[in-house]
């Protein structure tokens, strides 16, 4: 997979509070651009399928890796594009650094469009952590 972007922020809350919001599916629409709904029928664990609605269409992703309280990796495959989003929390008292690493790979004819697709992903999602941090200031 090729890195698309990395984003970092620090939130003035404990890692437990930040982590709880990060994995709260109901709050995802507040900070994931273009996501109108996010649901899953299973608990937050490796292999859980996530169903999200974006631009009027249902799509699926999966929890590919999980270190509770520390990191979660969401992976989705749409056509020949596989995207991975790794969210990492590092707790230090009442301040929690959070990092998002987005990467993707492409197969088949869509590979010809890889620079455009990576640019679109970067443009759409590189502000996720700023939006996520803002959910704490709106409390």
Could you say what each language-model-derived stretch is?
Residues 1-39:
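Hydrophobic ligand-binding cavity/cleft-lining segments
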Residues 4-6, 57-61, 81-86:
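Short, surface-exposed coil-to-beta transition loops
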Residues 5-7, 48-50, 85, 98-100:
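Hydrophobic residues positioned within well-ordered beta-strands of beta-sheet architectures
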Residues 8-12, 39, 51, 62, ...:
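Generic structural detector for well-ordered beta-strands
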Residues 12-16, 65-69, 88-97:
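A short, structured loop/turn motif at beta-sheet edges
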Residues 38-46:
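A solvent-exposed, acidic/Ser-Thr-rich amphipathic alpha-helical stretch
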Residues 48-55, 72-78:
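Short beta-strand segments that buttress and anchor functional surface loops
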Residues 77-127, 134, 138:
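Beta-strand/loop substructures that line and gate deep hydrophobic ligand-binding cavities in soluble
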């Amino acid at each position: 997979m090729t890195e698309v972007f990395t984003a970092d922020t620090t939130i003035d809350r404990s890692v437990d509070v930040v982590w709880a919001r990060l994995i709260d599916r109901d709050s995802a629409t507040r900070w994931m651009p273009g996501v109108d709904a996010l649901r899953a029928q299973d608990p937050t664990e490796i292999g859980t399928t996530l169903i999200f609605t974006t631009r009027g269409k249902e799509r699926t992703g999966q929890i590919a890796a999980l270190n509770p309280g520390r990191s979660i990796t969401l992976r989705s495959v749409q056509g020949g594009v596989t995207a991975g989003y790794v969210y990492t929390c590092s707790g230090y008292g009442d301040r929690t650094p959070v990092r998002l690493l987005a990467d993707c790979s492409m197969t088949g004819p869509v590979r010809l469009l890889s620079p455009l697709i990576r640019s679109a992903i970067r443009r759409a999602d590189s502000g996720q952590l700023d939006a996520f941090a803002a959910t704490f200031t709106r409390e």
